[in-house]
Amino acid sequence: AGFSADVAVFILRAQPFHFGHRAVIEQALAQAKHVLLLLGSSHQPRSPRNPFTHEERAAMIRASFSADGNARIEIVPLMDVLYNDPAWITNIRVAVERETRRLEPGNGNPSIALVGHSKDESSYYLRLFPEWHSIDCDNYRGINATDLRRAIFDAGGDISDDESAVVQYLRSVTTDAVIELLRGLMVKRDVVEVVEEDRFI
């Protein structure tokens, strides 16, 4: 179906998932047969910067796409090493090569594209993998997950009230499915403890 790549790779943290991530993944789905999401910070203890596990974040992503989209999306946890560390680059190459072999078993020369915002300083890693094409996406309405976490934490983690300012804000930046999942997560004891910890930082 006229795809420009066999596999599009998007490195993200999705703490939590929002419309910006979704727009990038939709663009990737339009251009590649398979979309491989590498979820960073995957084996970290919960913290104000990483409140959600990779399983919880994968559930947010899955809940935001149709069955057809999900059938072409692979989500793989990525260990955190400092971004400029050669070990991090190796981890990504190994994960991408392994998953590409699995997704395209008969393909001796699969085309791989890295997806990101080249204008965004956090995406300088696009330049770290010159052997892959790049699919450049605009930063969707300037949304970032730091602002979402900040809003939730500033509300003391309470996102139960549909009329509250924090829920109105969340509706403008993420899917209803993610908000429902977040509601379940924000009352978990270990997530409540992260919200408490954040108050003292």
Model-derived features: positions:
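Nucleotidyltransferase catalytic core that binds NTPs
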Residues: 1-200
